[in-house]
């Protein structure tokens, strides 16, 4: 579960390394976000020559969480890190590559471009 003040790793090649969530989109009092949810976050740590700058406010979709993901068939899924992919206003990823596996729920939520760029969909 991702909430306000949560720090996440960035799983794409935009140049941002870490972001900090400050709003979960999808309701006036929504507290937690999980895989496939969109959050508004601030860039906290960057690589040199990146397309985003430190302090930029960006939208991101969560692709991995340390909290369990419960599926309808009874199986559960858990990742090692909390990670996200930075997106634009239309929902397309800003980067051209995605690092690491992503959950299948990403495709179910309508982020087909992210799931097709990912090396593995679990």
UniProtKB/Swiss-Prot annotation:
Keywords: Ribonucleoprotein, Ribosomal protein, RNA-binding, rRNA-binding. GO terms for molecular function: large ribosomal subunit rRNA binding; structural constituent of ribosome. This is Large ribosomal subunit protein uL14. GO terms for biological process: translation. GO terms for cellular component: cytosolic large ribosomal subunit. The keyword RNA-binding applies. Binds to 23S rRNA. Forms part of two intersubunit bridges in the 70S ribosome. It comes from the Bacteria. Belongs to the universal ribosomal protein uL14 family. InterPro entries: Ribosomal_uL14, Ribosomal_uL14_bac-type, Ribosomal_uL14_CS, Ribosomal_uL14_sf. Part of the 50S ribosomal subunit. Forms a cluster with proteins L3 and L19. In the 70S ribosome, L14 and L19 interact and together make contacts with the 16S rRNA in bridges B5 and B8. The keyword Hydrolase does not apply.
């Amino acid at each position: 579960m991702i909430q306000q003040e949560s720090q996440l790793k960035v799983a794409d090649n935009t140049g941002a390394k870490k972001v900090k969530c400050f709003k979960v989109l999808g309701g006036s009092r929504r507290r937690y976000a999980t895989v496939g949810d969109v959050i508004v976050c601030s860039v906290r740590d960057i690589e040199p020559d990146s397309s985003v700058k430190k302090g930029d406010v960006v939208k991101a979709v969560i692709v991995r969480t340390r909290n369990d993901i419960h599926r309808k068939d009874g199986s559960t899924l858990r990742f090692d890190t909390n990670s996200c992919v930075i997106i634009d206003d239309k929902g397309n990823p800003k980067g051209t590559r995605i690092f690491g596996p992503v959950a299948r729920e990403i495709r179910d939520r309508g982020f087909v471009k992210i799931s097709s760029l990912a090396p593995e969909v679990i």
